[in-house]
Protein backbone atom coordinates (compact mmCIF):
# COMPACT_ATOMS: atom_id res chain seq x y z
CA UNK A 1 0.00 0.00 0.00
CA UNK A 2 1.55 3.34 -1.00
CA UNK A 3 2.46 5.79 1.74
CA UNK A 4 0.52 8.99 2.13
CA UNK A 5 2.51 12.06 1.12
CA UNK A 6 3.46 14.14 4.14
CA UNK A 7 3.01 17.88 4.07
CA UNK A 8 5.58 20.10 5.78
CA UNK A 9 4.30 22.01 8.76
CA UNK A 10 2.75 25.34 7.74
CA UNK A 11 3.65 24.53 4.12
CA UNK A 12 7.28 25.51 4.88
CA UNK A 13 9.96 24.89 2.29
CA UNK A 14 13.52 23.98 3.12
CA UNK A 15 14.93 26.85 1.03
CA UNK A 16 13.90 29.72 -1.23
CA UNK A 17 14.89 27.87 -4.39
CA UNK A 18 13.21 24.51 -3.76
CA UNK A 19 11.26 22.96 -6.61
CA UNK A 20 7.59 23.80 -6.58
CA UNK A 21 5.02 21.14 -5.86
CA UNK A 22 3.05 19.74 -8.79
CA UNK A 23 -0.21 21.20 -7.54
CA UNK A 24 1.12 24.61 -6.64
CA UNK A 25 -0.71 26.47 -9.41
CA UNK A 26 -0.18 27.77 -12.90
CA UNK A 27 2.21 30.54 -11.87
CA UNK A 28 4.95 28.07 -10.92
CA UNK A 29 5.98 27.39 -14.50
CA UNK A 30 9.62 26.65 -13.74
CA UNK A 31 12.22 26.80 -11.04
CA UNK A 32 13.71 30.27 -10.66
CA UNK A 33 17.47 30.36 -11.22
CA UNK A 34 19.37 31.95 -8.33
CA UNK A 35 22.49 32.20 -10.52
CA UNK A 36 20.57 34.77 -12.57
CA UNK A 37 19.38 36.59 -9.46
CA UNK A 38 15.77 35.78 -10.30
CA UNK A 39 13.41 37.20 -7.69
CA UNK A 40 10.13 38.08 -9.38
CA UNK A 41 8.36 41.15 -8.04
CA UNK A 42 4.85 39.95 -7.21
CA UNK A 43 3.37 43.05 -5.56
CA UNK A 44 1.40 44.93 -8.27
CA UNK A 45 1.47 48.13 -6.23
CA UNK A 46 5.25 48.28 -6.35
CA UNK A 47 5.28 47.51 -10.08
CA UNK A 48 2.86 50.41 -10.56
CA UNK A 49 5.06 52.72 -8.46
CA UNK A 50 8.22 51.90 -10.42
CA UNK A 51 6.53 52.80 -13.70
CA UNK A 52 4.83 55.86 -12.18
CA UNK A 53 8.14 57.27 -10.90
CA UNK A 54 9.67 57.02 -14.38
CA UNK A 55 7.18 59.68 -15.57
CA UNK A 56 6.88 57.97 -18.94
CA UNK A 57 5.61 59.79 -22.02
CA UNK A 58 3.69 58.24 -24.96
CA UNK A 59 6.74 58.90 -27.16
CA UNK A 60 9.26 57.22 -24.85
CA UNK A 61 11.41 54.21 -25.65
CA UNK A 62 12.02 52.23 -22.47
CA UNK A 63 14.73 49.68 -21.78
CA UNK A 64 13.93 47.13 -19.08
CA UNK A 65 16.72 44.94 -17.74
CA UNK A 66 15.56 41.57 -16.44
CA UNK A 67 11.82 41.70 -17.21
CA UNK A 68 11.16 38.32 -15.61
CA UNK A 69 7.57 37.33 -16.24
CA UNK A 70 6.60 40.84 -17.34
CA UNK A 71 4.89 42.37 -14.31
CA UNK A 72 6.64 45.72 -14.81
CA UNK A 73 6.91 45.29 -18.59
CA UNK A 74 3.16 45.27 -19.21
CA UNK A 75 2.68 48.48 -17.23
CA UNK A 76 5.47 50.21 -19.15
CA UNK A 77 4.02 49.04 -22.48
CA UNK A 78 0.70 50.65 -21.60
CA UNK A 79 2.38 54.06 -21.23
CA UNK A 80 5.36 54.11 -23.60
CA UNK A 81 5.89 53.94 -27.35
CA UNK A 82 8.15 50.89 -27.08
CA UNK A 83 9.79 48.64 -24.49
CA UNK A 84 13.07 46.85 -25.18
CA UNK A 85 13.35 44.03 -22.66
CA UNK A 86 16.85 42.60 -22.16
CA UNK A 87 16.71 39.13 -20.62
CA UNK A 88 19.50 36.64 -19.95
CA UNK A 89 17.25 33.61 -19.38
CA UNK A 90 15.54 32.38 -22.59
CA UNK A 91 12.70 30.92 -20.52
CA UNK A 92 11.89 34.34 -19.12
CA UNK A 93 12.21 35.88 -22.57
CA UNK A 94 9.60 33.45 -23.85
CA UNK A 95 7.37 34.10 -20.85
CA UNK A 96 7.32 37.89 -21.21
CA UNK A 97 6.65 37.51 -24.95
CA UNK A 98 3.76 35.14 -24.26
CA UNK A 99 2.42 37.60 -21.68
CA UNK A 100 1.42 40.10 -24.39
CA UNK A 101 0.98 37.72 -27.32
CA UNK A 102 -2.22 38.42 -29.25
CA UNK A 103 -2.69 41.87 -27.67
CA UNK A 104 -2.03 45.38 -29.09
CA UNK A 105 0.96 45.60 -26.74
CA UNK A 106 2.83 42.83 -28.57
CA UNK A 107 3.96 45.07 -31.43
CA UNK A 108 5.47 47.53 -28.93
CA UNK A 109 7.68 44.91 -27.28
CA UNK A 110 11.18 43.90 -28.38
CA UNK A 111 13.02 41.18 -26.46
CA UNK A 112 16.81 40.94 -26.58
CA UNK A 113 18.24 37.71 -25.20
CA UNK A 114 21.65 38.20 -23.63
CA UNK A 115 23.71 39.74 -20.85
CA UNK A 116 23.18 43.51 -20.76
CA UNK A 117 26.68 44.02 -19.36
CA UNK A 118 28.25 42.20 -22.31
CA UNK A 119 26.31 44.14 -24.92
CA UNK A 120 28.40 46.77 -26.76
CA UNK A 121 26.06 49.38 -25.31
CA UNK A 122 22.62 49.77 -23.79
CA UNK A 123 20.15 50.51 -26.62
CA UNK A 124 19.33 54.24 -26.92
CA UNK A 125 16.32 54.99 -24.73
CA UNK A 126 14.43 57.65 -22.83
CA UNK A 127 14.02 55.62 -19.65
CA UNK A 128 15.65 52.63 -18.01
CA UNK A 129 13.75 50.48 -15.52
CA UNK A 130 14.78 47.31 -13.77
CA UNK A 131 14.18 44.98 -10.89
CA UNK A 132 17.95 44.69 -11.05
CA UNK A 133 19.69 41.33 -10.58
CA UNK A 134 21.85 42.27 -7.62
CA UNK A 135 25.09 40.87 -9.05
CA UNK A 136 25.04 43.39 -11.92
CA UNK A 137 23.98 46.46 -9.92
CA UNK A 138 27.28 48.35 -10.10
CA UNK A 139 28.19 47.38 -13.69
CA UNK A 140 24.72 48.39 -14.89
CA UNK A 141 24.97 51.85 -13.35
CA UNK A 142 28.45 52.46 -14.74
CA UNK A 143 27.36 51.24 -18.17
CA UNK A 144 24.38 53.60 -18.14
CA UNK A 145 26.33 56.64 -16.91
CA UNK A 146 29.05 56.11 -19.53
CA UNK A 147 26.55 56.23 -22.42
CA UNK A 148 27.18 59.18 -24.79
CA UNK A 149 23.48 59.99 -24.47
CA UNK A 150 22.13 58.39 -21.30
CA UNK A 151 18.39 58.02 -20.65
CA UNK A 152 16.41 60.87 -19.15
CA UNK A 153 15.61 58.80 -16.08
CA UNK A 154 16.31 55.39 -14.57
CA UNK A 155 14.13 53.79 -11.90
CA UNK A 156 15.96 50.81 -10.48
CA UNK A 157 15.47 48.28 -7.69
CA UNK A 158 18.61 47.42 -5.71
CA UNK A 159 19.71 45.62 -2.59
CA UNK A 160 19.13 48.07 0.28
CA UNK A 161 22.78 48.49 1.27
CA UNK A 162 23.73 49.15 -2.35
CA UNK A 163 20.97 51.75 -2.66
CA UNK A 164 22.24 53.48 0.49
CA UNK A 165 25.66 53.77 -1.09
CA UNK A 166 24.14 55.70 -3.98
CA UNK A 167 22.84 58.43 -1.67
CA UNK A 168 25.65 58.38 0.94
CA UNK A 169 27.42 61.60 1.97
CA UNK A 170 31.16 62.27 2.40
CA UNK A 171 32.29 60.74 5.68
CA UNK A 172 29.60 58.03 5.70
CA UNK A 173 30.82 54.45 6.01
CA UNK A 174 29.08 53.54 2.73
CA UNK A 175 30.56 56.48 0.80
CA UNK A 176 32.45 55.06 -2.17
CA UNK A 177 33.65 55.48 -5.74
CA UNK A 178 30.14 54.49 -6.81
CA UNK A 179 28.65 57.34 -4.74
CA UNK A 180 30.91 59.97 -6.28
CA UNK A 181 30.38 58.75 -9.84
CA UNK A 182 26.60 58.66 -9.59
CA UNK A 183 26.35 62.10 -8.00
CA UNK A 184 28.82 63.63 -10.45
CA UNK A 185 26.93 62.45 -13.52
CA UNK A 186 23.35 62.43 -12.17
CA UNK A 187 20.99 63.21 -9.34
CA UNK A 188 19.89 60.26 -7.26
CA UNK A 189 16.71 60.06 -5.18
CA UNK A 190 15.48 57.34 -2.85
CA UNK A 191 11.92 56.32 -3.78
CA UNK A 192 10.79 53.51 -1.49
CA UNK A 193 11.73 50.52 0.61
CA UNK A 194 10.65 47.06 -0.57
CA UNK A 195 10.46 44.13 1.83
CA UNK A 196 11.56 40.58 1.05
CA UNK A 197 7.99 39.28 1.08
CA UNK A 198 7.21 41.20 -2.12
CA UNK A 199 9.33 38.81 -4.20
CA UNK A 200 9.02 35.25 -5.37
CA UNK A 201 11.16 33.55 -4.23
CA UNK A 202 12.02 35.99 -1.42
CA UNK A 203 15.65 37.16 -1.43
CA UNK A 204 17.78 37.13 1.70
CA UNK A 205 18.01 40.94 1.86
CA UNK A 206 15.68 43.93 1.79
CA UNK A 207 15.48 46.12 -1.32
CA UNK A 208 15.06 49.79 -2.21
CA UNK A 209 13.93 51.64 -5.33
CA UNK A 210 15.92 54.68 -6.47
CA UNK A 211 15.50 57.16 -9.30
CA UNK A 212 18.62 58.30 -11.14
CA UNK A 213 18.36 61.30 -13.48
CA UNK A 214 21.55 61.72 -15.55
CA UNK A 215 22.65 65.22 -16.45
CA UNK A 216 21.92 65.84 -20.13
CA UNK A 217 23.06 68.32 -22.77
CA UNK A 218 24.94 71.34 -21.44
CA UNK A 219 24.37 70.18 -17.86
CA UNK A 220 26.47 67.06 -18.46
CA UNK A 221 30.10 67.53 -17.28
CA UNK A 222 32.49 68.01 -20.19
CA UNK A 223 34.76 65.24 -18.89
CA UNK A 224 35.25 61.74 -20.28
CA UNK A 225 33.58 59.23 -17.99
CA UNK A 226 36.58 56.88 -18.17
CA UNK A 227 38.92 59.71 -17.18
CA UNK A 228 36.97 60.71 -14.07
CA UNK A 229 36.41 57.09 -13.08
CA UNK A 230 40.13 56.36 -13.57
CA UNK A 231 41.00 59.01 -11.00
CA UNK A 232 38.39 57.67 -8.57
CA UNK A 233 39.73 54.12 -8.88
CA UNK A 234 43.09 55.34 -7.60
CA UNK A 235 41.64 57.50 -4.83
CA UNK A 236 39.25 54.82 -3.55
CA UNK A 237 41.66 51.90 -3.87
CA UNK A 238 42.18 52.55 -0.15
CA UNK A 239 39.60 55.17 0.70
CA UNK A 240 40.82 55.75 4.27
CA UNK A 241 44.37 56.58 3.18
CA UNK A 242 45.34 60.15 2.38
CA UNK A 243 45.39 61.12 -1.28
CA UNK A 244 49.14 61.68 -0.98
CA UNK A 245 49.51 58.03 0.05
CA UNK A 246 47.11 56.85 -2.66
CA UNK A 247 49.22 58.54 -5.35
CA UNK A 248 52.47 57.23 -3.86
CA UNK A 249 51.67 53.58 -4.53
CA UNK A 250 54.22 52.30 -7.03
CA UNK A 251 51.58 50.85 -9.38
CA UNK A 252 49.85 54.24 -9.49
CA UNK A 253 53.14 56.01 -10.16
CA UNK A 254 53.88 53.56 -12.98
CA UNK A 255 50.45 54.23 -14.51
CA UNK A 256 50.92 58.00 -14.28
CA UNK A 257 54.42 57.78 -15.80
CA UNK A 258 53.13 55.69 -18.70
CA UNK A 259 50.21 58.03 -19.39
CA UNK A 260 52.38 61.14 -19.10
CA UNK A 261 54.86 59.79 -21.66
CA UNK A 262 52.01 58.91 -24.03
CA UNK A 263 50.49 62.38 -23.61
CA UNK A 264 53.81 64.11 -24.35
CA UNK A 265 54.42 61.91 -27.39
CA UNK A 266 50.94 62.40 -28.88
CA UNK A 267 51.07 66.17 -28.44
CA UNK A 268 54.76 66.51 -29.35
CA UNK A 269 55.49 68.14 -25.98
CA UNK A 270 58.94 67.94 -24.36
CA UNK A 271 59.21 66.57 -20.83
CA UNK A 272 58.57 69.32 -18.29
CA UNK A 273 61.83 69.38 -16.32
CA UNK A 274 61.04 72.72 -14.69
CA UNK A 275 59.30 71.03 -11.77
CA UNK A 276 62.59 69.38 -10.76
CA UNK A 277 64.06 72.76 -9.85
CA UNK A 278 61.54 73.28 -7.04
CA UNK A 279 62.97 71.73 -3.82
CA UNK A 280 59.54 71.65 -2.19
CA UNK A 281 58.30 69.24 -4.88
CA UNK A 282 61.32 66.94 -4.89
CA UNK A 283 62.24 66.78 -1.21
CA UNK A 284 60.78 63.32 -0.55
CA UNK A 285 61.67 61.64 -3.85
CA UNK A 286 64.31 59.37 -2.33
CA UNK A 287 61.59 57.58 -0.38
CA UNK A 288 60.32 54.57 -2.35
CA UNK A 289 56.70 54.60 -1.25
CA UNK A 290 54.22 51.79 -1.76
CA UNK A 291 50.81 50.75 -0.50
CA UNK A 292 52.13 50.14 3.01
CA UNK A 293 54.11 53.37 3.39
CA UNK A 294 51.34 55.59 4.70
CA UNK A 295 51.96 56.29 8.36
CA UNK A 296 48.45 57.45 9.19
CA UNK A 297 46.68 54.51 10.72
CA UNK A 298 43.09 55.64 10.31
CA UNK A 299 41.84 52.39 8.81
CA UNK A 300 38.20 52.51 9.94
CA UNK A 301 38.05 48.76 9.57
CA UNK A 302 38.43 48.45 5.82
CA UNK A 303 41.55 47.76 3.81
CA UNK A 304 40.24 47.92 0.27
CA UNK A 305 37.39 49.90 -1.21
CA UNK A 306 34.50 47.42 -1.22
CA UNK A 307 33.12 48.65 -4.52
CA UNK A 308 36.37 48.36 -6.44
CA UNK A 309 36.93 44.62 -6.67
CA UNK A 310 37.59 44.96 -10.40
CA UNK A 311 41.13 46.39 -10.26
CA UNK A 312 42.21 47.81 -13.64
CA UNK A 313 44.03 45.32 -15.86
CA UNK A 314 47.07 47.57 -16.02
CA UNK A 315 47.45 47.43 -12.23
CA UNK A 316 47.26 43.64 -12.29
CA UNK A 317 49.86 43.40 -15.05
CA UNK A 318 52.25 45.68 -13.16
CA UNK A 319 51.80 43.70 -9.95
CA UNK A 320 52.45 40.42 -11.75
CA UNK A 321 55.59 41.85 -13.34
CA UNK A 322 56.81 43.13 -9.99
CA UNK A 323 56.20 39.75 -8.38
CA UNK A 324 58.18 38.02 -11.13
CA UNK A 325 61.12 40.38 -10.62
CA UNK A 326 61.08 39.83 -6.87
CA UNK A 327 61.14 36.07 -7.36
CA UNK A 328 64.02 36.27 -9.84
CA UNK A 329 66.44 38.37 -7.77
CA UNK A 330 66.97 40.05 -4.44
CA UNK A 331 65.17 43.40 -4.37
CA UNK A 332 67.38 46.39 -5.00
CA UNK A 333 66.74 50.08 -5.15
CA UNK A 334 67.17 51.04 -8.80
CA UNK A 335 67.77 54.68 -9.70
CA UNK A 336 64.58 56.37 -10.91
CA UNK A 337 64.27 57.60 -14.48
CA UNK A 338 63.90 61.28 -15.26
CA UNK A 339 60.25 60.71 -16.24
CA UNK A 340 59.58 59.09 -12.87
CA UNK A 341 61.10 62.06 -11.04
CA UNK A 342 59.09 64.52 -13.13
CA UNK A 343 55.82 62.67 -12.53
CA UNK A 344 56.40 62.46 -8.78
CA UNK A 345 57.13 66.17 -8.67
CA UNK A 346 53.99 66.92 -10.70
CA UNK A 347 51.85 64.79 -8.38
CA UNK A 348 53.25 66.66 -5.37
CA UNK A 349 52.55 69.94 -7.14
CA UNK A 350 48.91 69.01 -7.85
CA UNK A 351 48.21 67.74 -4.33
CA UNK A 352 49.77 70.86 -2.80
CA UNK A 353 48.02 73.25 -5.18
CA UNK A 354 44.57 71.74 -4.57
CA UNK A 355 45.08 71.45 -0.81
CA UNK A 356 43.93 67.82 -0.92
CA UNK A 357 47.18 66.02 -0.08
CA UNK A 358 46.17 65.13 3.46
CA UNK A 359 42.48 64.50 2.80
CA UNK A 360 41.08 61.01 2.44
CA UNK A 361 38.87 59.92 -0.44
CA UNK A 362 35.96 59.28 1.92
CA UNK A 363 36.09 62.96 2.97
CA UNK A 364 36.05 64.45 -0.55
CA UNK A 365 32.97 65.29 -2.61
CA UNK A 366 32.62 65.28 -6.38
CA UNK A 367 33.75 68.91 -6.64
CA UNK A 368 37.02 68.05 -4.86
CA UNK A 369 37.67 65.23 -7.30
CA UNK A 370 36.86 67.44 -10.28
CA UNK A 371 39.31 70.07 -9.00
CA UNK A 372 41.93 67.34 -8.59
CA UNK A 373 41.35 65.95 -12.08
CA UNK A 374 41.59 69.35 -13.78
CA UNK A 375 44.82 70.10 -11.90
CA UNK A 376 46.31 66.81 -13.09
CA UNK A 377 45.27 67.63 -16.65
CA UNK A 378 47.11 70.96 -16.41
CA UNK A 379 50.25 68.95 -15.66
CA UNK A 380 49.67 66.54 -18.55
CA UNK A 381 48.70 63.58 -16.35
CA UNK A 382 45.64 61.58 -17.43
CA UNK A 383 43.94 58.42 -16.17
CA UNK A 384 42.39 56.69 -19.19
Curated annotation (Swiss-Prot):
Keywords: Cytoplasm, Methyltransferase, Nucleus, Ribosome biogenesis, RNA-binding, rRNA processing, S-adenosyl-L-methionine, Transferase. The keyword S-adenosyl-L-methionine applies. It catalyses: adenosine(1779)/adenosine(1780) in 18S rRNA + 4 S-adenosyl-L-methionine = N(6)-dimethyladenosine(1779)/N(6)-dimethyladenosine(1780) in 18S rRNA + 4 S-adenosyl-L-homocysteine + 4 H(+). It is an enzyme of class 2 (transferase). It is found in: Cytoplasm; Nucleus, Nucleolus. Its EC number is 2.1.1.183. S-adenosyl-L-methionine binds at residues 39, 41, 66, 87, 115, 131. Signal peptide: none annotated. The keyword Transcription does not apply. Pfam families: RrnaAD. GO terms for molecular function: 18S rRNA (adenine(1779)-N(6)/adenine(1780)-N(6))-dimethyltransferase activity; RNA binding. Its main location: cytoplasm. SUPFAM superfamilies: S-adenosyl-L-methionine-dependent methyltransferases. CDD domains: AdoMet_MTases. One of its GO terms (cellular component) is cytoplasm. Specifically dimethylates two adjacent adenosines in the loop of a conserved hairpin near the 3'-end of 18S rRNA in the 40S particle. NCBIfam families: ksgA (TIGR00755). Belongs to the class I-like SAM-binding methyltransferase superfamily. rRNA adenine N(6)-methyltransferase family. This is Dimethyladenosine transferase. The gene is DIM1.
